[in-house]
């Protein structure tokens, strides 16, 4: 993160909103109060969204086939959906380079190499889930799916998971505004909520909804007890 912060030359002043967002994301990363130094460093990565700044580190250590990309390759690349492309085509006073944009960059420029890498299968499942999200024709749903995809792939070593709070800040949305979108994606089996992580993941065909299984078994046990209650009472 320090390397990213030093590599970016900013013309616009970093405002309090960016520092607050950096603080929130840093806290959500490990669940403890972040140091002022970490918050400041993440803020200095503006106009990268704080989540992008964090994910670039594990991403840059990933080798995609023969294609070796460093953080500096990404920052200096004029490829479609890349950082330089964003700087030339966006109002950085109002807009951040967000996680969904990073996903688009990887898909457009690196997907063939990613598919033959050690995360190729996971990437393929992620793009299939995103394709199903695109069928909804809802921009927010598509963006959420892309954020979850990259956090699933690269956030684990950072203790970073797609909680409601992370997704809310990734899209700059209020929690109430994101709730309906998450419900829609769950109903369509595009994402799944994992209680043990308190976070969402993309749904794959092999996933089992444990909460649903538990509820079904509870109902079955309750029904069996009701059915045989007379026998139980007599035996006692």
Question: What do these predicted ranges mean?
Answer:
Residues 62-236:
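Extended alpha-helical interface modules used as scaffolds for assembling large macromolecular complexes
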Residues 1-82:
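Amphipathic alpha-helical segments of the small helical/lid subdomains adjacent to P-loop NTPase cores
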């Amino acid at each position: 993160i320090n390397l990213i912060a030093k590599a970016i030359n900013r013309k616009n002043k970093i405002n309090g909103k960016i520092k607050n967002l950096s603080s929130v994301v840093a806290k959500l990363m490990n669940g403890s109060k972040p140091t002022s130094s970490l918050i400041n460093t993440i803020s200095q990565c503006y106009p990268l969204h704080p989540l992008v700044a964090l994910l670039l580190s594990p991403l840059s250590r990933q080798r995609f086939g023969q294609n070796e990309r460093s953080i500096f390759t990404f920052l200096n690349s004029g490829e479609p959906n890349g950082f330089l492309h964003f700087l030339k085509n966006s109002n950085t006073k109002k807009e951040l380079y967000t996680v969904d944009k990073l996903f688009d960059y990887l898909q457009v420029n690196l997907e063939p190499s990613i598919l033959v890498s050690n995360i190729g299968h996971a990437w393929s499942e992620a793009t299939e889930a995103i394709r199903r999200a695109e069928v909804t024709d809802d921009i927010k749903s598509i963006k959420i799916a892309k954020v979850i995809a990259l956090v699933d792939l690269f956030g684990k070593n950072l203790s970073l998971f797609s909680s409601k709070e992370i997704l809310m800040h990734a899209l700059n949305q209020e929690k109430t505004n994101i709730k309906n979108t998450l419900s829609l994606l769950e109903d369509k089996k595009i994402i799944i909520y994992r209680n043990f992580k308190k976070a969402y993941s993309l749904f794959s065909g092999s996933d089992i909804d444990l909460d649903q299984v538990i509820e079904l078994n509870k109902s079955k046990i309750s029904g069996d007890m009701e059915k045989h209650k007379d026998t139980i009472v007599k035996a006692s």
